[in-house]
Amino acid sequence: MKTTSATVELVFIPSPGMGHLVSTVEMAKQLVGRDHRLSITFLIIKKPFDKSKVSSSTQSLLLAAAEDQLKFVYLPLDEAVAADLQSKFPDHNFILEFIKTNKQNVRDHVAKMVSTGSTQVAAFVIDMACTPMMDVAVEFGVPSYVFFTSNATALGLVFHLESLSPDEYHDLTELMDSDAELELPGFVNPVPVKALPTSFRDREFVPRVISLAKTLRQTKGIMVNTFEELESNAVRFLVENDKVPPVYPVGPVIHLVNNKNEEGEEATEIMKWLDNQPLSSVVFLCFGSVGSFGGDQLKEIAQALEQSGHRFLWSVRRPPSKGKREIPSEYQDLNQMLPDGFLERTNEIGKVIGWAPQVTILSHKAVGGFVSHCGWNSTLESLWYGVPVATWPMRSEQPTNAFQLVRELRLAVDIKLDYKKDICMSDSSNVMLVTAEEIENGIRKLMESENECGKERKQRVKEMSEKSKVAVVEGGSSYNSIGLLIEDFMKTT
């Protein structure tokens, strides 16, 4: 299939979120690696108000990915416009409105690309959070594909919500604090309403989900970061639904570790510490690029870790300033936030860090368990490296991911399935405190070999890890799906 020069140009527009960007870049690398006729230009929307280490890591990722067939263009960022939007729109509308302000930037750059006459743009590949850019694709007369960076289960729920009548989904929002369970497509077991995506709980947000479903139906295809062996029921529901565009399971799409030192000096120090720990002895706690906790919750986690007696590596981030929509940052003095003497007492068995090079850590043989927020990238990374998870979901589709991992697939143990916290805002008035006892119980289930539940989950994770690797090599389900996707790209020229 490979040829010597690119003949088909794709325009990729990823969301400014770190998790979305990482998987989108990896997807592009797979495509150009499979077919040299493809060339991809990324139009990068800069994340406003972000001066964190996460941003620096993003820059490093893009530099490392640069090659002849991949080009990265940073669209101009107007912080004043972003600040004005922040004052006008609530959190759940801000990002969408901010992305809309970049339509002219995208329009201008694509016009510049085609004006040379040497570039034939065949399609836009748009992140699920950037669907307003489909309007620009229409202006240039090219089709849009969407990269759905979450999973097939979440995609199925989006389409299912759209199929409900207004009375039905209003009834659904009113059930959210109850113990009701629902029969839903793509699931074997009844699903507690508390395990549904947090967007389904908000009457103001539900119309946005329905609008997304309608928009997705207008695409030429939907790429989903999953593989058939992991989500067979959800994939079947989507593929057999004649009202849904072609769905391409292309995962797991993750950024694999090639060089232990690629993350810098801090990562090197962390890896040296892990090198001195016994095999599968360390529980790793990390809650994503925007996950953070205040002092009360930190003390509960610290107490649980100390009481469990297990070795640990704990990523601790400081929440944004009150009322601010910011990325979490580093604590200046952890001693002030943690129980008195905690760091000294646990010095021999634990290490507390700030920002964490998550994939590098999960790949280390000393890591035996992962306390996670259940973001989908984190879930796929843990499965790839065969590290079992204790679930602590916070927002978006994370509660659904946790339910799927614990109850549907039996690949994880639970700490909490219905924890709710808006992790982008610091107002903690409605935050549920997870107790030290709950956390300790989850860690013990995860790490102790005599625990039958944990033992079973570890074996199932090992088996799924092997399946994830088979899916992406020649003859695997996702490998074949990517081949069909490339064929479809070629038909657009």
What residue ranges belong to the model's regions?
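Glycosyltransferase specificity loop/lid
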Residues: 1-493
